[in-house]
Amino acid sequence: MTISRTCIPAEFHTMSAAKRKVKRLVNNYARCPDAGEGEEQTLMALVTTEKMLKDAQAGHYAVGAFNVENLEFVMAVLAAAEETKSPVIMQTTPGTIKTAGLDYFYGMVKAAAERASVPVALHLDHGDGYDRCMQAFRTGYTSVMIDGSHESFEDNIALTKSVADAGRAMGVPVEAELGKVGGKEDDGPAVEGESPYTDPAEAKEFVERTGCTSLAIGVGTSHGVYTSDPHIEQSVVKAIRDAVDVPLVLHGTSGVPDEQVAEAVKNGICKVNYATELRQAYTKGFMAYMAENPACFDPKKPAKEGMREITELVKIRMTNLNSVGKAE
């Protein structure tokens, strides 16, 4: 079977060879493996987060970004997105990547996107340096985050701008972080004892000087498991929304009451990250099955229960973010 030119966007034919190579890397245009002889079909390829988040910003909803740990997580999150007809972002942290590598996770999520009826983006969460982000670009990730929040304001700007410039050249959006989201993200340093809020004036300057396409802000949330009642400072969300025009991102959302998250979305949050509670849900389902079936040695059986727990949780989160039906 030959690949028809109708499977490829018109602008692709007029690009330089270098730009075509970049476009292939980002959008992964390919033929459908299930197409019969003589049939022409285009895969639902991975998409970037740029249009996804701009649509959310215009429509006053948020896209859920879910950290995936393995194939079961990918399949479970996609099942929820399909059922709710929601756009979805799957993301991996450097800590998760250490278990297999960028290419393994890219392969899994790319395969999921090709079978999906909803938009799927693959995002590098908390990119821990310029080199890591370049590796993600080269692998085919369609969105990256550079986390310079532990640096000084000026050093964060310099680092973020270097990655944002590279992302712009490759057509890949770049998320940055300004302010301190508390707790500990995977293998990253713990953040304690600092102001949890991003300054709106600094946010405006930061976005203008770096060219980042979305911004994760500190509004009182924390990574990991909360040891006290979480609280989102909605006035900070509103002030930053008024100060910048790029989509805003909320980290450390696992365990935050739904009503607080929903209000933050109404106030301008466009992307909401979830990680810890997916791990908890999967482990809950897996361990419950093993407790009832201690002689089981087929990992697919307890994994199925873990996947079911994730799917149900993600459906609830997507409903709360008001993203249901936005992929139709």
Specify the residue positions occupied by each region the protein language model found.
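Hydrophobic faces of well-ordered beta-strands that scaffold small-molecule active sites
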Residues: 62-67, 88-91, 120-125, 144-146, ...
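Short, Lys/Arg-enriched N-terminal segments with co-localized hydrophobic residues
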Residues: 11-14, 20-43
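N-terminal amphipathic alpha-helix/helix-capping segment at the start of soluble metabolic enzymes
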Residues: 43-64
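C-terminal alpha-helical cap/extension of soluble enzyme domains
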Residues: 257-328
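Alpha-helix boundary/capping motif
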Residues: 2-7, 16
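Short gly/pro/ser/thr-enriched loop/turn and capping motifs at secondary-structure boundaries
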Residues: 96-98, 151-153, 278-283
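Alpha/beta enzyme core
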Residues: 49-53, 71-91, 95, 105-116, ...
